[in-house]
From Swiss-Prot:
Designated name of the protein: Alanine racemase
HAMAP family given in the database record: Ala_racemase
Cofactor names: pyridoxal 5'-phosphate
Family: Belongs to the alanine racemase family.
Group of enzyme by EC: isomerase
Coiled-coil ranges from the UniProt annotation: none
Species in which this protein is naturally found: Rickettsia felis (strain ATCC VR-1525 / URRWXCal2) (Rickettsia azadi)
EC number, UniProt record: 5.1.1.1
SMART domains cross-referenced by the UniProt entry: Ala_racemase_C (SM01005)
Amino acid sequence: MSLCTLEINLSAIKNNYLLLQDICKTSLVGAAVKANGYGLGAVQISKALIEENCRHFFVASSEEGVNLRKALASWHESVFRHCEKNYTVIRRSNPVKNSVSQNFFNYFSGLQQCFAPRNDGSSIHATTPKALDNDVNILVLNGVFEHDALELIEYNLTPVLNNLKQIEIWQKFSNLKNRLLPCYLHFNTGINRLGLTHNEIEQLINNRDLLKGLDLQYIISHLAVSEEIDNPYNLEQLNRFKTYLQYFPNVKASLANSGGIFLGQDYHFDLARPGAALYGLNPVIDLSNNLSYKEEFEGDTERRTAAYINVREDSSTGSTYKLPLEGGYSRGLQNPVTLKAPIIHLQNLTLDSHIGYNMTFTTERDSVIATLPLGYADGFSRNFSNQGEVFINGRSVPIVGRISMDLINIDVTDLPPLDIFLGQEAEIIGNYCTPDKIASIIGTIGYEVLTSLGSRYKRIYK
């Protein structure tokens, strides 16, 4: 068993989702859970967000989609059977008192209709776990390929089609199955990675038969610099996207990623698809600075206070919106991740002692050095050598020497003696040192910090 623990606070992720939904108002909010939910657990996160009425989950590949669908199908089966067995108990009393959480009950409140008598008074009827499962949309961002098309159909996955070849493949399997197949189209408006090009979009506009057999549910695009609020390229992409959408007036649209949500309602359309912001990462550069506005609003079950920054005007409505400040739900986005490692070795070193590979650190005094059981094999970058920090009881402790595959050394000399003992936990990631802060030390982004978290940690969901 791993000595290190990675705690993922699902309540924090839920709260981040609810905050984003508040900002998006009437637009739907989905969730990017690709790369195993940014390293935090796609299945667990999806279940938690389903309880908050999230119904759109974005993965990168068909493999990720199949794994998620299988897990959710199994969960829906168990939940359905639980409700079927305990429906009478649930109906007659407060569900919370019967070991059924309020969120759990709310999500499956539709089952009241499934198990209720028909209007004509005839026998009780029920839906199926499959019907519950089909209510959850799993979108595959990389699209469809010949080798996985049947798998997408079998597991009810919706591909985001990125070029005419993928459209052709999906149309071929539509003909094979003799039914409409659901899809999203991705229009490239300037990020120049995936997405139909301008010439390909013109072909679709001029020849709608290219989409025959396809159930086109959404048209999406992706912003290149949404974290830079004042970058004019955001508006360029928005205008390009709107121009294309004029030719598809009855199709829903999605543009905003995490940063796009904070660009204003012009960017929200029918569906936003945040990733980073769900996991407590700053979606906008300098988001946590310049507190300037405070607003109270009424939630469904409680009164919340949210602090915001940088009041901006929405060009489409003339109304203002506010950007949330880091730090706890009542102040904005929460960090849901805490990584802890215990001290497994202590030693007293004299002045001029060398530490770690290649002797990159030399003590400048008599020192107490502690060793923690994690390293670059666990996603803790070697770039933290001699420049990172951890926290013990809220006190900063420097990393000394090279990060090795499985171990790091820290200098605990300045800690109170009572805080220095074998088994004492050091906080590697947490509220003292968020993924964004860690990323800034080594010149990367919080996304990379989270997705690099290794498989050897004991993961605890709360």
